[in-house]
Curated annotation (Swiss-Prot):
It catalyses: rifampicin + ATP + H2O = 21-phosphorifampicin + AMP + phosphate + 2 H(+). GO terms for biological process: response to antibiotic. This is Rifampicin phosphotransferase. The gene is rph. Residues 1-313 are annotated as: ATP-binding. It comes from the Bacteria.
Amino acid sequence: MSSFVLDFQEIEKTQLFLVGGKGLNLGELSNIQGIQVPEGFCVTTVGYEQAIGKNGAFQTLLNQLAMLKIEERDRIGEISKQIREVIMAVEIPVDVVESVAHYLSHFGDEHAYAVRSSATAEDLPYASFAGQQDTYLNVIGKENILQHIKKCWASLFTDRAVIYRMQNGFDHNQVSICVVIQKMVFPEASGILFTADPITSNRKVLSIDASFGLGEALVSGLVSADNYKVKEDEIVEKVIATKKLAIYGRKEGGTERKKIAPNQQKFQTLTEQQILQLARIGRQIEAYFGCPQDIEWCLVDDTIYIVQSRPITTLYPIPEVNDGENHVYISVGHQQMMTDAMKPLGLSFFLLTTSAPMCKAGGRLFVDATQRLASPASRDYLINTLGKSDPLIRDALTTVIERENFIKLLSDDEKEKDLSKNVPPASSQQQPENDPEIVTNLIKNSELSIEELKRNMQTKSGVDVLDFILEDIQQLKKVLFNSQSIAIIMAGMNASSWINEKMEQWLGEKNAADVLSQSVQHNITSEMGLALLDVADVIRPYPEVIAYLQHVEDDSFLDELIQFKGGEKVRDAIDAFLNKYGMRCSGEIDITKTRWSEQPATIIPMILNHIRDFEYGASKRKFEEGLQEALKKEKELLERLQHLPDGEQKVEETKRMICNLRNFIGYREYPKYGMIHRYFIYKQALLKEAEKLVQNNVLNEIEDIYYLTFEELHEVVRTNKLDYKIIHKQKNAYKLYEKLTPPRVITSDGEIITGKYKRENLPAEAIVGLPVSSGVVEGRARVILNMEDANLEDGDILVTAFTDPGWTPLFVSIKGLVTEVGGLMTHGAVIAREYGLPAVVGVENATKLIKDGQRIRVHGTEGYIEVL
């Protein structure tokens, strides 16, 4: 066995570093009984590394490439081209040339071969990289093959491969390349087999694409392919494409395109028997690798050859339940306005805090709704409740229920038992007294509890810290699920629903509660947005401080402020803001996310924008304007009601509900603020313990604790021992999860059920969502995916995936809101109503459909957006 060249049969599972992802998978496939793989061998990474290892020009250019940022596309292109030229000019090591000649004589010099790149960062379970390097078909002759080996080496530095590595965090120095030399087969048909449906992600449905000739035509998008769907050894769907072209190999080498005769273009590529045979092969390969596969196949004289198999890395993972039953899962992140992947410690804390049973998948949390959907008593309540906050979830759940036999409905006897335990409590129960002091007292009790936690935490160390946190989480749950607190929140929400329903019924006015909700008391989140305007007012008179803050890059700036006139006053104002709100950040329900207090420079761009866009005293003006609008709307509604039949009674009922709304609706944001405050205290204590673990050489980095569950961290602190494989495994998983888009609803088959909005009476080009804050507004769309990248001007419309309280400071600068995630009572909706901003949420793919800088019109009352 040569270290330069390995036959497919010689490749071992541990040799990724030698043969890359594609080569390793071909070696594995060759060892599966009954699977036909065209013969071939791999020119290992050793040959490539010897060829370029001592090349000074190559190393110099590689170092230059490593210094570039992904935005520098032109420079990346220039250096990548120079690297490719250097590689094409190198001599292939003699040992490689001799080994290739030996294997070619063994397999047949006269044969045609496919020459394929196989990078060490390709076809991995957590990063596909498919198609980033080059493939050459029907290459004949030793010298020709050697030249194409160099072309494959050079393709490691195509612009697309370099940029893809940069996007995925791979070091160019750490990636190597092998070249696969595989005997060509000349198929009548070829294509791609997915062992899970790539459209719906259903793991029980195989999807086969098939066309005539070589698969290159299909992969490169030259032809449409037949598509066959197979489920449980039965063909459940066939779409026969019009196939006008095919690519075939030429005897003298290379490939050629051929037109297909018109009378043959609609022929089915594979017979039913061949489709089912291919499906069985796919399931066999999937079982061997242990995960869904993307498989390239060829049909030659009734024999199916497999030329490649790689993991499908784009499928959303399924929550693990191994009971053989069907399950339906609902995303928690879509309700919490945080759909980012969470690290293991973040997931642990949220699971410890919540009262509802949840399961993990893809770095997110899901609730198993199966039992509640099976029960007539709870099904309608669940669907209607979720439907108010997210119509897409309601539509998806309705789709599942309408499928026969997917969810086992309860029998008549079970229905009787279920009625007694599953009927939700009536909303009239526990109606609180209409007294704003109740809210004041709840807030005061929460603040006292947090101060006590701070004092107690200072006395703990080691494993006692973790034990104490577990105890305190019970206290946190008592605060979060306090019956009086929940009653207050429900009273505010019910008042909002009542006002909207009755005002539309009696006066024909839609969403009247939106204006009435402006500038209410006790909304800790909207108060935070206004407080940052006040900080801007403190800084405004000091031009030296403003000039300094415009160039702040690290978090030591607070201590340096005192060298400027007004600097101490500015520092105190920022400190005061951080003392009250510094535990917040974007994605704050994940305890591992960096808080404003940990990185104060994060809030400086927002402050500078406020100084630029607003006059002194803007926070008080904004609050007063909102209050006057709300009072004016109340007066107008009551006057109109007075003239209706039973007007006096309607006025009294409405006044009471408006009072409920304005007294209670602001409090809805407070329990979460208390939870996040506690999380920050827990986090600070855990980071101190992590620092000790680093000092004791148990951890490499303090933030490695984020990749442990709470239970694992407890054990590490107790024993001072850690198997670092856990950290590496979770880091790789998190990298994958970050790239995935979580579904609102997913089944135990892995099928993603997507809901749809009703489009009646809307413009044809309208982008539809859920109306949550009334009004119509036109403006420049600013598509922002990370709050840190926000550069908003007064009057912009914010378009983003989701907003949570950490985004609130941006709301004072915008005049409209569009989000991909959200509901009537989620963060963005509540704050938009309070600030009087037209808003549409739950807009599927809003950040892709709307381009940054486009002028758009947001219809916050009707729930759609127009691109102008």
